[in-house]
Amino acid sequence: MRRIVITGATGTIGMAMIGLCIRKGVEALILCRKDSARAGRIPVHPLIRFRYCDLSQMKDWQPEEQESYDIFYHFAWAGTTGTARNDMYLQNKNVEYTLDAIRLAGRLGCHTFIGAGSQAEYGRVEGKLNENTPVRPENGYGI
């Protein structure tokens, strides 16, 4: 059985991943910040393990003994709305948090790390995005 880790699980992509895990019989460790207003949306299910871990805590977070996973999905990001989108100190901190997540993935035994971006990296685009779409971010969140 595959075992995965998900950050940003209370967002749209994260919630869809949790549902997919349950349907496919994949065990998932959900890392969620303590003050998340949407933590209650995470389903209680035998395949879903829930642990509190803020982005700023990933650097020092230690897995339990014998805790090992295959794939780490990193969907968490701070400052995705309002004026925080242009707070470059916070957006740069997100880069550091992502590096911390990569290191945590290693401590958890993950052989694969998948990090998701957003449309903000492309700016305003007519039509569908694809791997050849030029990036023209319009705010710090997109950079």
Predicted regions and their residues:
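Rossmann-fold cofactor-recognition segment
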Residues: 44-58
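Conserved Rossmann-fold NAD(P)-dependent oxidoreductase catalytic core, especially the SDR/UDP-sugar
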Residues: 99-139
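Short beta-strand element of Class I
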Residues: 27-29
